[in-house]
A protein has these predicted regions:
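A residue-level marker of the well-folded mature domains of exported/periplasmic proteins
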Residues: 1-162
Length: 162
């Protein structure tokens, strides 16, 4: 797996993806499919393509790239290494690419449910959401869903987002 910029144990997107990759490797091993997992922590966005290439050149059959920011580098690597399978987490491809599977999650729906729950539990009519940066589309979608879910339960609720 190639992480987005940051560490694999970031308690966020990189870590969630890595835990999924490790889980897959363990499960595949129970079916007598020899599978191993490793990661490269990306230190700078300019290194996405290089890091993906390191795994592709080492003979990996499949590479997971974590985050929407790796989308272009993933597609470029897929074209350069057609025998390697790629999974792009939070990546959407406008055109189908045979060796790329993009995983998109409905963050707005998860946010809606969280906001609805928070509003239904509020005793003051005020709830809050602590979100990450507004530069990350999935975080924005979750936040919008949160507000919509809260307002669905209580149209007058005050929602504080940070």
């Amino acid at each position: 797996m190639v992480t987005d910029v940051g560490e694999v144990d970031d308690k966020s997107f990189n870590q969630s993806a890595w835990e999924g990759v490790k889980g897959f490797a363990q499960q595949a091993g129970t079916f007598a499919v020899p599978t191993s997992a490793d990661y490269i922590e990306t230190q700078d966005a300019k290194d996405y393509a290089t890091n993906i290439g390191l795994f592709a050149e080492s003979g990996c059959d499949g590479i997971v790239t974590e985050g929407f920011a790796l989308g272009e580098a993933t597609l470029a690597a897929a074209a350069k290494y057609p025998d390697v399978k790629f999974i792009g987490v939070d990546q959407w491809q406008a055109e189908a690419v045979p060796n790329v599977a993009g995983l998109i999650f409905p963050e707005d729906q998860a946010g809606f449910l969280a906001g609805a729950l928070a509003a239904s539990m509020s005793k003051t009519g005020i709830i809050a959401a602590v979100l990450g940066t507004d530069l990350v589309p999935p975080v924005v979608a979750f936040g919008e869903g949160y507000v919509n879910g809260a307002k669905h339960v209580d149209p007058d609720i005050k929602v504080i987002k940070t």
